[in-house]
């Protein structure tokens, strides 16, 4: 299987399967002499780690990361950084039923159609478990962009959205939903309980903003910052849609409404102040100095207890019920993953910009 790598200068590759002995990432192109230890990576993995509430999979994985290469005496050496996370709580017997039948909405059939073989234990590479490696790699990328602050939050679950008037960034780490609206988080408790008891699942929308990004990162046409961000987010398992800034909403605006008006800078510099940010901090594929903003749509988890009509490998009609431990809303734990992909993309573009423009 190819296409497991992302990035141009800062390039990372993820490896491993959901029910294999381990998974991980190799980060290549990281500048030398940056301070790095497992302690710099672990807090981000802990945010994504499963089994921390009844609203996520009950698979108990400590997700302890090990740095195998690329670091000497606490500093990056400029050589590939290999990161490994062991799997310790696999229950492959739960997946016997899907060895011969495909889960609608999952990658089972597509993998069989392409490769003629698939690891049905937890979905293999198509499992959300793969994203642990992205989060580890993203923690390394953050060291390359210390001037940038990245925050992601769940903005909507099952069609129930937060109220922007109640937005409080400090609330994100105070509830199991990465939710900045306490009232919405309370509603989601009941919403998630209802879906789980029904043997079903829910989708979610994640919003992510990166502040401190200077003007100038990105490139025209085929290396646009927004196109790379879209590819980064769409590469996350279970993601079905990405918006930059106002996204699809711009199609409903007039030109004067969509434009982000500029005024002379309040700090006296030659950089303008913007009065709005419909562009999401990117114009012509290049950052403007405003916050870079993306919205990411996660589909409902395909592995559910509700019987779903399908076909088995013999071509026979059947119903499938996916037993085992699964996220009733995979988007909840998607927030740290979206942050990681934002960091990896921005770090890559910072190094690209430095290579071309100094």
From Swiss-Prot:
Assembly: Homotetramer.
Organism: Sphingopyxis alaskensis (strain DSM 13593 / LMG 18877 / RB2256)
Any one GO molecular-function label of the UniProt entry: FMN binding
Enzyme class: lyase
Its job: This reaction introduces a second double bond into the aromatic ring system.
Gene name, Swiss-Prot/TrEMBL: aroC
Protein name: Chorismate synthase
Catalytic activity field: 5-O-(1-carboxyvinyl)-3-phosphoshikimate = chorismate + phosphate
Keywords assigned: Amino-acid biosynthesis, Aromatic amino acid biosynthesis, FAD, Flavoprotein, FMN, Lyase, NADP
Disulfide bonds: none
The EC number(s) this enzyme carries: 4.2.3.5
């Amino acid at each position: 299987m190819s296409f497991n790598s992302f990035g141009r200068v800062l390039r990372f590759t993820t490896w491993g399967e959901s029910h294999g002995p381990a998974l991980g990432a190799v980060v290549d192109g990281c500048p030398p002499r940056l301070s790095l230890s497992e302690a710099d990576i672990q807090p981000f993995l802990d945010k994504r780690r499963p089994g921390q509430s009844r609203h996520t999979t009950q698979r108990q994985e400590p997700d302890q990361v090990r740095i195998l290469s690329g670091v000497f005496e606490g500093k990056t050496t400029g050589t590939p950084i290999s990161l490994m996370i062991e799997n310790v709580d696999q229950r492959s017997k739960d997946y016997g039923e899907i060895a011969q039948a495909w889960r609608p909405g999952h990658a089972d059939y597509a993998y069989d159609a392409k490769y003629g073989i698939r690891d049905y234990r937890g979905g293999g590479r198509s499992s959300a478990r793969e994203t642990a490696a992205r989060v580890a790699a993203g923690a390394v990328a953050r060291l390359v962009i210390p001037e940038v602050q990245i925050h992601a939050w769940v903005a909507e679950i099952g069609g129930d959205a937060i109220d922007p008037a109640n937005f409080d960034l400090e609330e994100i780490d105070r509830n199991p939903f990465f939710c900045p609206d306490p009232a919405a988080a309370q509603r989601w408790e009941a919403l998630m309980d209802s879906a789980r008891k029904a043997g079903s699942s829910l989708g979610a929308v994640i919003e992510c903003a990166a502040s401190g990004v200077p003007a100038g990162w990105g490139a025209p046409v085929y290396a646009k910052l927004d196109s790379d961000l879209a590819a980064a987010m769409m590469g996350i398992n279970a993601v079905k849609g990405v918006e930059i800034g106002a996204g699809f909403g711009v199609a409903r605006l007039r030109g004067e409404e969509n434009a982000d008006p500029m005024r002379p800078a309040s700090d006296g510099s030659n950089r303008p102040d913007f009065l709005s940010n419909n562009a999401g901090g990117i114009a012509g594929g290049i950052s403007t100095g405003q916050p870079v903003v993306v919205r990411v749509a996660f589909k409902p988890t395909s592995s559910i207890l509700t019987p779903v009509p399908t076909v088995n490998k013999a071509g026979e009609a059947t119903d499938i019920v996916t037993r085992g431990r699964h996220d009733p809303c995979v988007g909840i734990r998607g927030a740290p993953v979206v942050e990681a992909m934002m960091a990896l993309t921005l770090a890559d573009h910072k190094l690209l910009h430095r290579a071309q423009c100094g």
